[in-house]
Amino acid sequence: NPAVGCVVVKDGRIVGLGAHLKRGEPHAEVHALNMAGERSEGATVYVTLEPCAHHGKTPPCCDRLLEAKVARVVVASVDPNPLVSGKGIARLREAGIEVVSGLLEEEERRINAAYRKYITTRMPYVTLKIALTLDGRIATRTGDSRWVTGPEAREAVHVLRHRHQAIMVGVSTVLADDPELTARLPVPAMQPVRVVADSRLRVPETARIFDGKTPAVVLTTEQADPAKADRLRELGAEVLVCGPGPRVDLRLAMRRLGEREIASVLLEGGGQLAGAMLKAGLVDRVKLFYAPKLAGEDGIPAFAFAGPERMADALRLEQIEIEHVGGDWCVSGVPVREGGT
């Protein structure tokens, strides 16, 4: 579901606040109007996305706005959901309520980028996260990577895990580190689905991702051992065959995750998986956590894919954001190539 907030203003004062906190629960408008009570009459309502006009898991927000007799509704954006798109605005206007659209629209699009991609493509929004040295290495020549970045950057990564529905790594990461792939924060966190790409099912049955604390999904190929797949299913994992092989068909894998209503994926795999996802055009945003360290030319590179012959054809990042995180830096951007994303 999208991130939606609502503010009710009457005579220049905020009289109601609300947010959509959980799927199936009342929408932001309902919470805000309940808080405002009778003061909603004649008020202006500011909301992130246009109010819904259809019956879903909750009643239409337009009905509640009409009951409250608000005078004006200001929305950041039209909802891209085909069930909603334009219908909510039209219904409010037909009822005589003034509707203004487009206020802070770019900010809304950035906040709800994952929702917008999923609702229009049924494919998850993929964020690639990498911790690396200034010379682009994710580990030393021996494979040691504990720790590339400092504690503040590592905590920021746990926040990212909390904000994504799934974490995805390659089997090499599981074999090398046996990670838990959980969000560990000082406060209760949402735990993502744990996803591993493993074309031949080399993942150990004793791996911590099969501890049953959160769901695990293994993406594999037709070349994998069926008996091993059955054993993983007995451990509670979901095994999805994504193509004939020899490698996992990553685009098909993303479609399969989308079919399971996974709208966002945090990609934390090594250089091979990161490179393959970038080359396939499946990464929507890159977050690079740079540590002020140098690992040398024999360190393990962050991106394992053949580069272009010309610099003009290199993958570049747009919409750049740079943040100081403890003693490290986070560079975030949207990957694009010449001629399109």
Describe the predicted segments one by one.
Residues 24-25, 89, 103-131:
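Proteins enriched for Cys/Gly/acidic motifs involved in redox and nucleic-acid/cofactor modification
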